[in-house]
Regions:
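A short beta-strand micro-motif common to beta-rich folds, especially ectodomain repeats
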Residues: 210, 246-258
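Solvent-exposed, low-complexity, repeat-rich "mucin-like" stalks and linkers
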Residues: 190-215
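Aromatic-lined carbohydrate-binding/catalytic grooves of carbohydrate-active enzymes
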Residues: 285, 299, 303-418
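C-terminal beta-strand-rich structural cap/linker in extracellular carbohydrate-active enzymes
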Residues: 631-657
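Glycan-recognition surfaces
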Residues: 390, 438-541, 562
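Gly-Asp-aromatic-enriched flexible segments
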Residues: 24-182
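Carbohydrate-binding surface patches
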Residues: 523, 529-532, 537-539, 575-614, ...
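Strand-loop-strand motifs at the edges of beta-sheets in extracellular beta-sandwich domains
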Residues: 228-244
Length: 657
């Protein structure tokens, strides 16, 4: 008995000594001492010991000296090296949002399993997390947006620390899968691509380049053109002017040495333009203030030489920074903002806007420009306040086909943000545009204020931004894209919801880098924007386009979903945890369906045919791979990678009699 007591005593002594040794050797490692810049987040930059806005971290009235300030959606990967014993933190929205309507949910994954999640936290609320990490090798800190979207989601991991016995943790870059090109190469035989319908106002200049692929040279023809329009058989450019009101069924034909392609193309001469979402390129996401005449010409050249124009991409849009910048000492952008007649001047980077416009038009492409209803643009260049009529006339004189009208400094003019004040500047410019003998697509950019999707068309908008600016992160792109649910009833031919430009390829707002979206995320991006019937505006430097990016942007079956003549925006038909299914009816009676996995890891996504309102066993086609997959029965189920998509087309099959 005494020997047993001695053994127990010895074991307890050994255990206590071991615990003492571990306690003595354990370190406290603050999360903020690690490289938190490896975090990926939806807005702003991550900060150590500061909020996302760079202020001292403060949650629910308590200020914290240590912590990690970020913005939902946010993800930070941490290699624990198997030596971490525990983690704890206070979490919540930073008080710097001053009671604004943000809300977030915090989550922690340990070795690919969800280990903890908070309730939805709003301004003034906080909670504490404490986790045992014994044996855990990898940890992921997540902050998710909730149903109210990403605005004001300034999230803090306050006093976040690890207890570690051994090597210290280190943050790591998020995993990134290899690029896989899914789009098949275009056939050498001729194929006509892009939109099947086009709207023009009576008497307005008409310009349309038939998008077609196939071995060059191609020969183009168009039978049934309305009076006043002609086609160049060598370039496929249809031009002229017509007042022949009505719908004109035109048969387009493209031939080469290998065959012939035909397609019906409807020209609608009436009071509505932008019958399909505009497709093209915008300068801001790659060049920002560095934009100039030569870069615009190079973009037009690249749209042709790359072959993207053969898939329907048509607009070359100049964003901010083309006008005079008041008070600047840079001679390239300083000078007289307007001439003696009040007409706006371009700066020296754009020496001849009419010549630039003519150059773009000579290729069968269209050109766009940018302004603001306030005195200054967002980058402090001259804008249209009190000169709306002058500027609309100047834009038409220059030959512009598209106007992005950005709220910017008008926030200092508006008395408040009631509906009348929000609509007023856009009505004013719309009236001015309507007096021009030129069709100018009118793009409202005011970040969704006042639920612009409910009234954008009433003030003359052809499209309207529904959110703030997009960035090339999963958190930004997915938050904006999936946040379009419920807005579908406000979109249609001539008036489109706009979730912002595409962030694939070389982007960077002046400092170019490859998109931070993973390959799977980029497929999700293009698939979702196509289902949403969104304007598609490329934001990358097209002179540096790689094969992966080109193939993302040149899949004709994906583009046809976006450009479908019905103009129906996809509807969210399923949203469960991190799985979503969206469906878009198409003109030919088929249904485009996107099955999305928003989760951190590969998972199965299923949807029943009943939920899709489909009877029978429809034919299934993989749209990206352009491959038939047989027939569906009862439901669709696919294993989809993290942040990935399966984009399919379901076509009813007629029963044989």
């Amino acid at each position: 008995m005494n020997s047993v007591k001695k053994l127990v005593f010895f074991c307890l002594l050994t255990l206590g000594f071991a615990s003492f040794v571990i306690a003595q050797s354990a370190d406290t490692v603050w999360l903020s001492s690690l490289d938190v810049t490896k975090a990926r987040q939806g807005w702003g930059d991550p900060h150590a010991d500061k909020s996302v806005d760079g202020n001292p971290i403060k949650i629910a009235g308590t200020t914290y000296a240590k912590g990690f300030g970020t913005h939902a959606g946010s993800v930070l990967y941490i290699n624990l090296r198997g030596t971490a014993l525990s983690f704890e933190s206070q979490v919540g929205l930073d008080d710097e949002i001053n009671g604004a309507a943000g809300s977030v949910r915090f989550k922690i994954y340990c070795d690919k399993k969800e280990s903890w999640k908070s309730e939805v936290l709003k301004a003034g609320e906080k909670t504490k997390v404490k986790l045992d990490l014994n044996g855990v090798k990898e940890m992921i800190l997540l902050v998710e947006t909730t149903e109210d979207g990403p605005n004001w989601d300034h999230a803090d991991w306050a006093e976040a620390k690890f207890i570690v016995a051994g090597l210290h943790p280190e943050t790591v870059d998020p995993p990134r899968e290899k690029e896989e090109i899914l789009t098949p190469k275009s056939s050498p035989e001729p194929r006509i691509n892009g939109a099947k319908i086009y709207g023009v106002r009576p008497g307005s200049p008409f310009l349309f380049r038939i998008p077609a692929t196939g071995k060059r040279p191609l020969k183009y023809a168009a039978k049934g053109l309305p009076q006043g329009l002609t086609i160049n058989a060598s370039t496929g450019i249809i031009s002229g002017s017509t007042s022949d009101i009505g719908k004109h069924k035109v048969m387009l034909t493209v031939t080469n040495s290998l065959g012939k392609a035909e397609r019906q193309f409807t020209i609608v001469v009436g009071n509505k333009i932008a019958l399909t979402p505009p497709m093209g390129w915008n300068s801001w996401n790659c060049f920002a203030e560095a934009v100039d005449d030569q870069k615009i010409r190079s973009a037009a050249d690249a749209l042709i030489s790359s072959g993207l124009a053969d898939h329907g991409w048509a607009y070359i849009n100049i964003d901010d920074c083309w006008a005079i910048k008041p008070g600047s000492d840079d001679t390239m952008v300083s000078g007289n903002a307007r001439d003696k007649n009040g007409m706006i001047n371009s700066n020296k980077k754009f020496p001849d806007m009419k010549a630039l416009s003519d150059y773009v038009h000579s290729k069968g492409l269209k050109i766009g420009i940018y302004s603001s209803p306030g005195p200054l643009t967002c980058a402090d260049y001259t804008a249209s306040y009190h000169h709306e009529a002058d500027d609309a006339k100047q834009f038409a004189n220059w030959g512009m086909d598209y106007l992005k009208y950005d709220w910017c400094s008008y926030g200092n003019i508006a008395k408040d943000k009631n509906l009348i004040e929000l609509q007023k500047p856009y009505l004013t410019m719309n009236d001015a545009l309507n007096k021009q003998k030129r069709d100018i697509v009118y793009s409202l950019c005011q970040y969704g204020m006042g639920n612009v999707w409910t009234w954008g068309s009433a003030v003359g908008g052809n499209c309207w931004r529904t959110t703030g600016d997009i960035t090339d992160t999963w958190e930004s792109m997915s938050g904006i894209g999936f946040g379009q649910a419920g807005k579908e009833k406000f979109a249609g031919p001539g008036h489109w919801n706009d979730p912002d430009m595409l962030v694939v390829g070389m982007v960077g707002w002046g400092n170019l880098h490859p998109s931070r979206l993973s390959p799977n995320e980029q497929y999700t991006h293009i698939s979702l924007w196509s289902l949403l019937a969104s304007p598609l505006l490329i934001g990358c430097d097209m002179t540096q386009m790689d094969d992966f990016t080109f193939n993302l942007l040149s899949n004709d079956e994906v583009i046809e979903i976006n450009q479908d003549a019905l103009g129906i925006q996809a509807k969210q038909v399923l949203s469960e945890d991190d799985k979503e299914v969206w469906a878009k009816p198409l003109e030919d009676g088929s249904l485009a369906v996107g099955l999305f996995n928003k989760g951190m890891f590969a998972d199965y996504v299923s949807v029943s045919l009943e939920r899709l309102n489909i009877k029978g066993s429809p034919a299934v086609r993989d749209v990206w791979r352009q491959r038939n997959l047989g027939f569906a029965n009862v439901s669709l189920t696919y294993k989809i990678p993290a942040h990935g998509v399966k984009l399919i087309k379901l076509t009813p099959v007629e029963k044989k009699k």
